[in-house]
A protein has these predicted regions:
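Nucleic-acid substrate recognition interfaces
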Residues: 1-365
Length: 365
C-alpha cells in the first residue's frame, strides 16, 4: 500500500537564490490573483466557470518566464481547489492573496529526478540548482520525492519534501498493552495508568513577554519601519512557541506509540469546547488536535491501534469500579466520589480508566 510522508528542513540559499525564491513567491501570488480575478469576472458576465492557464499570462508578463513553471501551475491548481472547497461548503469564497499578509510559499513537483538530495547537504531544485540544506533527518532510499514546498518564515527559509513510499504494515497481535487518555486543559492528558503529560504550557510561560512586545507595537506608527521590526519580533516569538510545542508533542507521541499497542481517546470537539467555555488560549496552547494526528500516524506505521470513542460517552460521570453513572458532575469537582461503591478517585484518572475499558471492549482485547 502507498503512503505519503513529509520531511521538513531548513535551507540556506545564497543571495542569488534568495532573490529568485522571493521573485517566485511574487509570481505565484500574481498568477493566483490574476486567475481568481478573471474567473470571477467571467462568471459575472456569462454565469459560467473558466480557469485560465499560467501559460496564457506569459506573453503579456515576460517576468513569469524567469521562474519555475510548475510553481505557477500549482498556483492555478490552488485556485481550482479553493473553488471546489467553496462549492462543497468546506471553506469560504476564495480571497485574493496580499503581498504583506499572505504566507510566502510555493510548491514545485519532481519530474525526471529534478528534485534530489546530493552529498547529504544539498537540495537540488528546478531553476535554483543546489541549495545548502540542514539534512538532520535522512529520507529512506525507497521513498520517492513527489513535490517540495518552499516557505519563508520570519526571514528563514524552509522546505517541506513530500515523499511517497510503499509499505506492508503488519498488524500487532492483540494483547493487554492498551492505554486510555483523558484530555486535560492544563496537563494535555491524564492516562489510565495515572500518568500526566506534564505539558510545559509554552504560550502561558511566554505570555507576559508577548504582551510587552505587543504593547510596544501599539505605540509605534503603523506601517513604519520600526512597526515592521517590532512585528517581526512578535512573529519570531510565536514561531519559537510553536516549535517548542511541536517538538514536545513529537517526542511524547513517539514514546506512547512505541510503548503501547493501542491508544484510546475521546472524539472531542476541541474548537467548540474552547469557544463555549472561554478556554481558547489553554486549549490552543496544549495542541491536543496536533498531538492526536501525530499519535495516529505513528501508531498506524507500527501496525498498532488508534481508537476514538464517542464524545457523548460519559467518561467523567461513570464510576470506573462499579459502573454507576452520576446525573451531574460539575467542572469544579476535581475528584470523583461514587455513591454506590464509595470509591474516591481523581476525576481525570477515573475518566481515563473508563476510556481504556470501553476501548478494550470495542477492540475486543
Amino acid at each position: 500500500m502507498k503512503y505519503n510522508l513529509a520531511f521538513k528542513y531548513r535551507i540556506y540559499p545564497n543571495k542569488e537564490q534568495e532573490l529568485l525564491i522571493n521573485k517566485t513567491f511574487g509570481c505565484v501570488r500574481f498568477v493566483y490573483n490574476t486567475i481568481l480575478y478573471t474567473a470571477n469576472k467571467f462568471y459575472e458576465e456569462t454565469g459560467k466557470n473558466k480557469i485560465i492557464t499560467p501559460a496564457s499570462l506569459k506573453s503579456e508578463n515576460q517576468f513569469l518566464k524567469e521562474v519555475d513553471s510548475l510553481a505557477l501551475s500549482n498556483a492555478q491548481l490552488n485556485v481550482k481547489w479553493s473553488f471546489t472547497n467553496f462549492f462543497q461548503k468546506r471553506a469560504k469564497f476564495p480571497k485574493f492573496k496580499s503581498k504583506k499578509k499572505s504566507v510566502k510559499s510555493y510548491t514545485t513537483n519532481c519530474v525526471n529526478n529534478s528534485i534530489r538530495i546530493e552529498e547529504n547537504k544539498y537540495l537540488v531544485l528546478p531553476k535554483l540548482k543546489r541549495i545548502k540544506l540542514k539534512y538532520h533527518r535522512e529520507i529512506p532510499k525507497n521513498y520517492r520525492i513527489k513535490s517540495v514546498t518552499l516557505t519563508n518564515s520570519n526571514g528563514n527559509y524552509y522546505v517541506s519534501i513530500l515523499t511517497e513510499f510503499e509499505k506492508e504494515i503488519q498488524k500487532v497481535t492483540s494483547n493487554d498493552k492498551v492505554i486510555g487518555l483523558d484530555f486535560s486543559m492544563s496537563e494535555l492528558f491524564v492516562s489510565s495508568e495515572n500518568q500526566r503529560a506534564d505539558y510545559p504550557r509554552y504560550f502561558r510561560m511566554l505570555e507576559e513577554e508577548l504582551k510587552k512586545l505587543q504593547k510596544s507595537l501599539s505605540r509605534k506608527v503603523k506601517f513604519s519601519k520600526n512597526w515592521y521590526k517590532q512585528k517581526m519580533k512578535i512573529s519570531k516569538l510565536h514561531e519559537y512557541i510553536k516549535n517548542c510545542r511541536r517538538d514536545f508533542l513529537h517526542k511524547l507521541s513517539k514514546k506512547l506509540s512505541e510503548t503501547y499497542n493501542a491508544v484510546v481517546v475521546e472524539d472531542l470537539n476541541i474548537r467548540g469546547m474552547s469557544q463555549a467555555l472561554n478556554f481558547g488560549k489553554s486549549v490552543g496552547d496544549n495542541g491536543w488536535g496536533m498531538f492526536l494526528r501525530m499519535l495516529e500516524y505513528k501508531l498506524m506505521f507500527l501496525g498498532k491501534q488508534f481508537l476514538k470513542i464517542d464524545k457523548w460517552f460519559p467518561s467523567s460521570k461513570t464510576c470506573s469500579r462499579c459502573g454507576n453513572v452520576k446525573d451531574e458532575l460539575k467542572l469544579s469537582e476535581r475528584s470523583y466520589k461514587c455513591e454506590c461503591c464509595g470509591i474516591e478517585i481523581d476525576r481525570d484518572y477515573n475518566a481515563a480508566l473508563n476510556i481504556k475499558n470501553i476501548g478494550k471492549e470495542i477492540l475486543k482485547y
